[in-house]
From Swiss-Prot:
Any one GO molecular function term: ATP binding
Active site: 301 (tele-amp-histidine intermediate)
Gene Ontology annotations for the cellular component aspect, listed alphabetically: cytoplasm
Subcellular location: Cytoplasm
Keywords: ATP-binding, Cytoplasm, Ligase, Nucleotide-binding
EC assignment: 6.5.1.4
Protein name: RNA 3'-terminal phosphate cyclase
Length: 331
């Protein structure tokens, strides 16, 4: 039994997602206590409960304490199996965050895992589904990871209603020494149940800032009439990206500006990955037993993921400060 203190480090839901994923992959039972202890709403949220429930289905796990508000849980995994699953997170719970828990597990299945997930595609405090598709999966493909994502409907806060199909194939992860990539900045600016000019203004503002800084960019715009009302923009270049959801009272120009300046901040440093991707890569480097990347700084999320990963796997991470960047590798 691997005991995890859920209040360690940043003390958020990512500890739970990472621990459950690694428990399923390694077959090691885990007990997680003090979940989100110091957060305004301690314990498991609805989307955490849903993610753990699906993880349990994938590995036929026995569980204890899996309910909204629970601060102590136990997870007893068995064999991982493929299949087709339909998941409704409810309202605008993040589809990308749920996939962060499921993706490491699915790669160790004996057959493909097909998922239809309903929830939020572009919400605050979570990667957008476009970021997951174009940055996270692009990086993981270098390690042999195979996953295809189709965005059928977008879901915004608070109604959600987005629909994403994902097919994850069994694969063997291999180490990769990620290096910096440059090229044309790409992106998608979108809105639903709003005038088309909202998406266009987001894109125009972002493009103006990026081109003024000397970058070539191509930003697609898209307007739809889905269940929920909202907007957002995701920009990416190599293994760096930014994502900003629109919100009531914030102008389209502000949304585009924030996305562009966030990406520019990452591109100013010669690191290979951005700060968001860095913490997502940690468990995969551990599972591959090798690899390295550089990032502009090590975030609390990344430190926490390293701590959790070292609890489950027989690996040790090395953190080296190099001028204006940080190199993270497996020793």
């Amino acid at each position: 039994m691997i005991d995890i203190d859920g209040s360690y480090g940043e003390g958020g839901g990512q500890i739970v997602r990472n621990a459950i994923a690694l428990s399923a992959v390694t077959g090691k039972a885990t007990s997680i206590k003090n979940i989100r202890k110091d957060r305004p709403n301690p314990g498991l949220s609805a989307q955490h409960v849903k993610a753990i429930g699906i993880a349990a289905l994938l590995c036929d796990a026995k569980v204890e304490g899996i309910k909204i508000g629970s601060t102590n849980i136990a997870f007893f995994p068995q064999e991982i199996r493929g299949g087709k699953y339909t998941i409704d997170i409810g309202t605008a719970g993040s589809i990308a965050l749920l996939l962060q828990c499921i993706m490491p597990i699915a790669t160790y299945s004996n057959t493909n895992i097909k998922l239809e997930i309903k929830g939020g595609t572009d919400v605050s405090w979570a990667p957008s589904i476009d970021y997951l598709k174009n940055v996270t999966l692009s990086a993981l493909s270098k390690m042999g990871y195979r996953c295809n994502i189709d965005i059928l409907k977008r879901g915004y806060y608070p109604r959600g209603g987005g629909i994403v199909n994902a097919i994850i194939e069994p694969s063997h992860l291999v180490p990769d020494r990620f290096s910096e990539e440059r090229g044309t900045i790409r992106g998608i600016s979108h809105c639903s149940n709003l005038p088309e000019h909202v998406a266009q203004r987001q894109a125009d503002k972002a493009k103006a800032i990026l081109e003024n800084a000397g970058h070539e960019c191509s930003i697609e715009t898209c307007r739809t009439d889905f269940t929920s009302t909202g907007s957002g923009i995701t920009l990416y270049c190599g293994m760096k990206g930014s994502f900003v959801p629109g919100k009531r009272g914030t102008t389209a120009e502000k949304v585009g500006n924030d996305a562009a300046t966030s990406l520019l901040d990452e591109l100013l440093t010669p690191s290979s990955v951005d700060i968001h991707l860095a913490d997502q890569l940690i468990p995969y480097l551990g599972l591959a037993e090798g690899g390295s990347f550089t990032v502009k700084e090590i975030s609390p999320h990344t430190k926490t993921n390293i701590w959790v990963t070292e609890k489950f796997l027989d690996v040790k991470f090395k953190i080296e400060k190099r001028n204006d960047i940080v190199k993270i590798s497996i020793q």
